[in-house]
Design a protein with these regions (language model features):
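Juxtamembrane intracellular "pre-TM" segments in multi-pass secondary transporters
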Residues: 2-4, 186-217
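Helix-breaking motifs and short loop linkers at transmembrane-helix boundaries and internal kinks
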Residues: 41, 73, 94-100, 111, ...
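Conserved MFS/SLC helix-loop-helix module at the cytosolic interface between two early adjacent transmembrane helices
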Residues: 60-99
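Paired small-residue
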Residues: 84, 88-91, 99-107, 303-311
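Helix-loop-helix hairpin linking two adjacent transmembrane segments in secondary transporters
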Residues: 100, 129, 137-182
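Cytoplasmic helix-loop-helix junction between adjacent transmembrane helices
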Residues: 104-145
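C-terminal transmembrane helical hairpin of 12-TM major facilitator-type secondary transporters
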Residues: 278-322
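A late C-terminal transmembrane helix in Major Facilitator Superfamily
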Residues: 326-362, 369-370
Length: 414
């Protein structure tokens, strides 16, 4: 008997909240880092280890929950992830030492990764082609809003209840998503589920990683994520220290740039297909990053920098939507693993690029990271699109020949 399907509205809200785990788990407690050093009587570097641990957990956890959800289904895997998230968050609140807190942040990141990776897998289960791209664009827009809202909400909650108040809110969010997971109807039928033997898991990973087109799409996604994290890591110093903006002015500009990503991710689905959106977005990224690189080296004024950064991040949002949709469409039969690798490589590139942004002259370093990331992502996009276009040309030629043969047959019959 076919199970009852969730409404589209519920699916959008639920998947959007799951995908927002990344920014909420990572960014929400940033305003309280200085006060936590006093609470745990430790150094700032030890407190920042909690942020590093959560990022590692968010990357590694996707490689765990992706294959697990392919075997046991999305709903049961979500329930396990949400329960683990609640337990680890409660543990963070009750932590007495910084080492306990860091260890539990790692577990919290792994659990949060379950929500992120399974949300994309559910979208791939339920939608395909342009509909999948539209759903991922909506999820990306919600994720972009969460990126803006997380530090602002964290600052507000820290005024009320300190860092404990922030983690109490995360606990409340986990309860809501656990309830949503109970209400969610399984999207992966038992016939579609994969064997969980280690040999089969490794075989499926090998199958996915041998798909060159998929690899190009996720590499393009990861390199674009590197451009985004280069901006996140450098923008506070460029805007506040170099251009002299106040924290409030910086927050407004940071929020405006995030909104640019939200808008462009929805614009991407207006293209005829996602390949056109990826081609346009990656080309525009390369052009804008080249101009921004030159502007930062020459010492431009603030409004030139902000205008170029705004436009660059808009193209980042567009390529995120296109490359993630194309990657997931390439490996529909291994959606969990495909989603896991996509998310893991994104956080991996983000983790590599973030510390590099602080080396040397930050204006020059940031400009170089923007240019290098955009150039490499453009090359990956071009390679993937060229493979598709060559296949399409061959297919078109075959259909053309068949049509000519059919027409010749009709003429002979007459």
């Amino acid at each position: 008997m076919k199970s009852r399907q969730n409404s589209r509205t519920f699916t959008i809200i639920f998947l959007g909240m799951l995908s927002a785990f990344g920014p909420f788990v990572m960014d929400m407690y940033l305003p309280t880092l200085p006060t936590m050093t006093g609470y745990f009587n430790t150094s700032s570097s030890m407190v920042q280890l909690g942020l590093t641990a959560s990022m590692i957990g968010l990357a590694a956890g996707q490689l765990v929950f992706g294959p697990v959800s392919d075997k046991f289904g999305r709903r049961s895997s979500l329930l396990a992830a949400m329960i683990l998230f609640l337990l680890s968050t409660a543990g963070c609140i009750l932590s007495e030492t910084i080492l306990q807190f860091v260890a539990l942040r790692l577990v919290q990141g792994i659990a949060g990764a379950g929500g992120v990776v399974i949300s994309r897998s559910i979208a791939a289960d339920k939608y395909a082609g342009h509909e999948l791209a539209a759903m991922l664009a909506i999820i990306g827009a919600i994720n972009g809003i969460a990126t803006v809202a997380a530090p602002i909400a964290g600052g507000t909650l820290s005024e009320i209840g300190g860092w404990h108040g922030i983690f109490c809110f995360l606990l409340f969010l986990g309860v809501i998503l656990l309830a949503g997971s109970f209400h969610f109807n399984e999207s992966l039928s038992s016939e579609q589920r994969a064997s969980m033997r280690w040999s089969n898991v490794f075989r499926r990973f090998r199958t996915v990683t041998r798909n060159r087109q998929y690899l190009c799409y996720i590499l393009q996604y990861g390199l674009t994520m590197g451009v985004l994290f280069a901006n996140i890591a450098s923008a506070p110093f460029i805007m506040q220290q170099h251009y002299g903006l106040s924290p409030m002015e910086f927050s407004l500009c940071f929020g405006a740039n995030a909104i640019a990503m939200v808008i462009s991710s929805t614009v991407a689905v207006r293209f005829r297909n996602m390949k056109d959106a990826l081609g346009f977005g990656s080309s525009a990224m390369l052009l804008l990053s080249t101009v921004l690189f030159v502007a930062l080296y020459l010492g431009c004024n603030f409004w030139i920098y902000e205008t170029l950064a705004f436009c660059l991040l808009a193209m980042v949002g567009m390529t995120f939507t296109a490359s993630s949709a194309l990657a997931m469409d390439c490996e529909r039969t291994n959606a969990g693993i495909a989603s896991a690798l996509l998310g893991a490589i994104g956080f991996a590139f983000g983790g590599i690029v973030s510390p590099l942004a602080g080396l040397g002259n930050i204006l020059h370093t940031a400009g170089l990271l923007f240019l290098a990331g955009s150039l490499l992502s453009h090359l990956c996009a071009n390679y993937a699109l060229a493979r598709h276009n060559s296949t399409r040309r061959i297919t078109d030629e075959i259909f053309y020949m068949l049509r000519r043969a059919s027409a010749s047959t009709r003429i002979l019959r007459k």
